[in-house]
Amino acid sequence: HDVTLFEKSSRLGGKLPLAAMIKGVEVEDVRPVISYLTTQVGKLNIKVRLGEEATVSKILAEKPDAVVIATGGLYRLPSLKGVENRNVAGVNSLSKQVKLPLLVFGPELLNKLTKLFLPIGKRVAIIGGQIEGLQGAVFLRKRGREVTVLEPSETFGKGIPPRYLDRLKPWLAKKDVQLLGGVTCDQITDQGVVITTKDKQRKLIEADTVMVLLSQEPDTSLLEALKGSVKEVL
């Protein structure tokens, strides 16, 4: 196949460098994946258009027989009072903050540097208890933060392979990371997160920093826009 790859940022890899920085190398080293895929793109003579967002007009100008959409999902902030407060951070804002440091230091060195300095409060409440939230909890606990994870469902760790999750949950318990399931987050304040527990009790989870690490939602906008214009859209 003759392949053209659009990437709106200035480098390949998407959020993999961020994932590599958060995960570290102890359990799952993501860095070789980034290196391997980037190398293969070069070896296979794939036309890479960095710094270009894949718009409908640009795609159709290529006159493609098929389009594979791999733009990733959307990380949205919930409709929650106080979510725009200064003590709140989400995946998108965190990605912007670490973009330059990742370019300068790389994932491994930045992972080590965050153990020396991390501009996040001592007490952290994480909204979202699936793969993003639990990996964030591990990262922060290893850096001395007191972590509480708030999850609306009763299930934690969706997206994490079972063999890892079976080891992760005991580790979190041993490190005093609080996992609160079946809760409703009512409001974010300067003092933390006001929640309603599954037994209908209203309480404040005290936190200096609130991190919204909810799972991403599908982004089907480009898929819908291309329907009928290209023979195959995947």
Please describe what each predicted stretch is.
Residues 2-44, 131-183:
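Rossmann-like dinucleotide-binding cores of NAD(P)H-dependent redox enzymes
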Residues 41, 66, 92-94:
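C-terminal catalytic ATP-binding subdomain
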Residues 24, 66-67, 230-231:
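Secondary-structure boundary/capping signal
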Residues 1-12, 49-61, 70-84, 92-160, ...:
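Rossmann-like dinucleotide/flavin-binding elements
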